[in-house]
Curated annotation (Swiss-Prot):
ATP binds at G152, G153, A154, G155, V156, G157, K158, T159. It is an enzyme of class 7 (translocase). Keywords: ATP synthesis, ATP-binding, Cell inner membrane, Cell membrane, CF(1), Hydrogen ion transport, Ion transport, Membrane, Nucleotide-binding, Translocase, Transport. Transmembrane segments: none annotated. It is a peripheral membrane protein. It comes from Shewanella denitrificans (strain OS217 / ATCC BAA-1090 / DSM 15013). It is found in: Cell inner membrane. This is ATP synthase subunit beta. Signal peptide: none annotated. Disulfide bonds: none annotated. Its EC number is 7.1.2.2. It comes from the Bacteria.
Amino acid sequence: MSTGTVVQVIGAVVDVEFPQDAVPQIYDALKITGEGACKGLVLEVQQQLGGGVVRTIAMGSSDGLRRGLEVVNTGSPISVPVGVATLGRIMNVLGEPIDECGEIGEEERYVIHRSAPSYEDQSSSTELLETGIKVIDLVCPFAKGGKVGLFGGAGVGKTVNMMELINNIAKAHSGLSVFAGVGERTREGNDFYYEMKDSGVLDKVAMVYGQMNEPPGNRLRVALSGLTMAEKFRDEGRDVLLFVDNIYRYTLAGTEVSALLGRMPSAVGYQPTLAEEMGVLQERITSTKSGSITSVQAVYVPADDLTDPSPATTFAHLDATVVLSRQIASLGIYPAVDPLDSTSRQLDPQVVGQEHYDVANGVQTVLQRYKELKDIIAILGMDELSDEDKTAVARARKIERFLSQPFHVAEVFTGSPGKYVSLKDTIRGFKGLLEGEFDHIPEQAFYMVGTIDEAVEKANKKK
């Protein structure tokens, strides 16, 4: 173990000088050993500048750091605890417990920088994962072992949707979950912990948090720490769920680190290595012949612009994309999923079956027609439409409302109990709507209900 000294501190970037014959390797973890507030602070080597000097990024607050402090090279990258000891615990990027429940007591640690599984080891599955959320199960179904992105601007419900997915899948799935909070609000991390505790599934979830107030190095690596824990469960032959909130903050942390390291920015100020950094993370989130990782990632969309380099780079890696729309949210329809923009590789008659495919296609066709007619209705009114178009508009409005659904995790502020709708009931309901079975029921009856039977019951009560 070689020792060096701090020679320069610029915010989160720290330059450390080592003897010429003992220069640390890229990604090695260094530890500050000197006395003071910074004792034990971990630095990760990013660049070798020559002359024995390495440039590092601090994994914690650099307050109190000064030149001349002694630094020890640990000789390996950052490692985190893995295995069953991590379940029910909250850890930081270094795998240290932050829930005041004592030591983790792990039997094994893995380094967070690992290579993705080889082509031979990877496997793909077409088995569907039912979420109980109508719009998702119908239009953009998830695959077991697939990657899903929840795209949306600020305040359209990414985190609430993710919480509902965790609530529905983690409980029904009864497998293990890993939650990586990357640069999000501490309050949300706190809510999530108590949500899991109250519902009795905390002992099946490992949580890794690197929240908004953390330095960029911490936020850049916390997703890898969470993923490493998920990989261990997968390699043991289990099916594991990985939730990442928010993948955009991972990109943003990369941008901050890149600027601090003095790299020339590329489009819109992002780091020049954006695609590579995203690939390093996403290629590891995959299923192998031994087990599967099903991942759900929230993706913040800056200024609601899906062509922004960060969400655009993420799109390429996903099997299903759930796009949340501000327009739909403004109509009071939640979840605010855009059924015309959301896609899934699984929506194929050979995977989901002909009936499901036809119903999903029919719903999209009717909604697309309504979208096209909106301008005519705004200018000339409904009376100018043909009878066929009037029927299409009436059905589309009912479908729009029927795509809404009360969530379990939102019971506190909506006051209505959450609903889990099976795929069979979802298809039956939308098929009936498309075939005109419910043309006699007013559209208000379809708003915020679970199954179609509830809508019929609601309409009968109002009579």
